[in-house]
UniProtKB/Swiss-Prot annotation:
Gene3D superfamilies assigned: Nucleoside phosphorylase/phosphoribosyltransferase catalytic domain (3.40.1030.10), Transferase, Pyrimidine Nucleoside Phosphorylase, Chain C (1.20.970.10)
Keyword Metal-binding carried by entry: yes
InterPro entries xrefs: Anthranilate_Pribosyl_Tfrase, Glycosyl_Trfase_fam3, Glycosyl_Trfase_fam3_N_dom, Glycosyl_Trfase_fam3_N_dom_sf, Nuc_phospho_transferase
Chain's gene name: trpD
Protein's UniProt name: Anthranilate phosphoribosyltransferase
Task performed by this protein: Catalyzes the transfer of the phosphoribosyl group of 5-phosphorylribose-1-pyrophosphate (PRPP) to anthranilate to yield N-(5'-phosphoribosyl)-anthranilate (PRA).
Subunit text: Homodimer.
Keywords: Amino-acid biosynthesis, Aromatic amino acid biosynthesis, Glycosyltransferase, Magnesium, Metal-binding, Transferase, Tryptophan biosynthesis
EC number: 2.4.2.18
GO biological process per UniProt: L-tryptophan biosynthetic process
Residues given in the record as anthranilate 2 binding sites: R168
Length: 349
């Protein structure tokens, strides 16, 4: 099926099969479609509402065309990632949580990009910290193996995305591609915490990842709108484990964490996000730093559980608390800065 045939189906509110979606995505991602066709396709899909089959097909093609990162093992390797678009503009929680996970003994294959609608994307934050982003796949793999955390810059590993960049920018609306980023980790991780911008996506995306071979995944959305675990409200979870998806909710109090507002955690730049994270991972001299530390732990703990390094969310959160409060997480951030600095010099030659 070509994109014109797909458009004809979509305007008649007919779904595509996984194979049909793969065919259309290959055309888009190899430069065979015009911007008008891509824009019409994305809006048509959104108006119709994307099915699990369609998302599976789109993800499969993006993974196929990605510049992958080969790791010696995927056991205990996890990604902590969100779709973004929650409008909260709080600091980069998932990036900070990644250093805590690494400090607790996990391996983090972090996939991310620059900010689209927010004030600070994961790439923006890490760049502000002095971490070199333009790494080859082999260099990323060494970071993960040696430091315990490595960052895969989406625009480096998903070069075919350039064909959809123009239409996405001109539309200025959430489209299918907002869902695809967290599902297309270049290292092929099978353990993830995926934050989404609406609760309605939790179970469908867990089912998508089940179809694509994931092993232990938490797809989450908090009641206050965050695409991650929150301190201020209950968080809805669709958990994929042992081949089954189940849904439930948790609150901070379930883990001995005080429920509190997110006031003071908003940032207006990557530098502001970095300063808050350094305080949270360091001596926590400010009230905001103390609160940020709690939120980081609330998100790092589930990642340790998803990585099967903890037998429960409660145990994962305790491990994360210990890793943060010993200062090891801050050391991991500094270690990644130093480790990637060597590659900055190598790649400049």
């Amino acid at each position: 099926m070509d994109i014109k045939g797909a458009l004809n189906r979509i305007v008649n509110q007919l779904d595509l099969t996984t194979e049909e979606m793969q065919a259309v995505m290959r055309q888009i991602m190899t430069g065979q479609c015009t911007d008008a066709q891509i824009g019409a396709f994305l809006m048509g899909m959104r108006m119709k509402s994307e099915t699990i089959d369609e998302i599976v097909g789109a993800v499969a093609v993006m993974r196929e065309l990605a510049d992958g990162v080969q790791l010696p093992t995927l056991k205990h390797v996890v990604d902590v990632v969100g779709t973004g678009g929650d409008g909260a503009n709080i600091f980069n929680v998932s990036s900070a949580a990644s250093f805590v996970v690494a400090a607790a003994g996990g391996k983090v294959a972090k996939h991310g990009n620059r900010a689209v609608s927010g004030k600070s994307g994961s790439a923006d934050l890490l760049e502000a910290a002095g971490i070199y982003l333009e790494l080859t796949s082999e260099q990323v793999a060494r970071c993960i193996d040696t430091v315990g955390v490595g960052f895969m810059f989406a625009q480096v590993h998903h070069k075919a995305m350039k064909y959809a960049a123009g239409p996405r920018r001109e539309l200025g609306l959430r489209t299918l591609f907002n869902m695809l980023g967290p599902l297309t980790n270049p290292a092929g991780v099978r353990h993830q915490v995926v934050g989404v911008f609406t609760q309605e996506l939790c179970k469908p995306l867990a089912e998508v990842l089940k179809r694509l071979g994931s092993e232990h995944v938490l797809v989450v959305h908090s009641r206050d709108g965050l695409d991650e675990f929150s301190l201020a409200a209950a968080t809805h979870i669709a958990e994929l484990k042992d081949g089954e998806v189940r849904e439930y909710e948790v609150r901070p109090e379930d883990f001995g964490i005080k429920s509190q507002t997110l006031m003071g955690l908003e940032v207006d730049s990557p530098q502001a996000s970095l300063e808050l994270i350094r305080d949270a991972l360091g001596r926590r001299k400010t009230e905001a730093g103390q609160k940020a530390a709690e939120l980081i732990v609330m998100n790092a703990g589930p990642a340790l559980y998803a990585a099967d390094l903890a037998t429960s969310l409660h145990e994962g959160i305790q491990l994360a608390h210990d890793a943060l409060h010993t200062g090891l997480a801050r050391e991991k951030m500094d270690e990644l800065v130093a480790f990637t600095a060597v590659y900055r010099e190598e790649n400049a030659q």
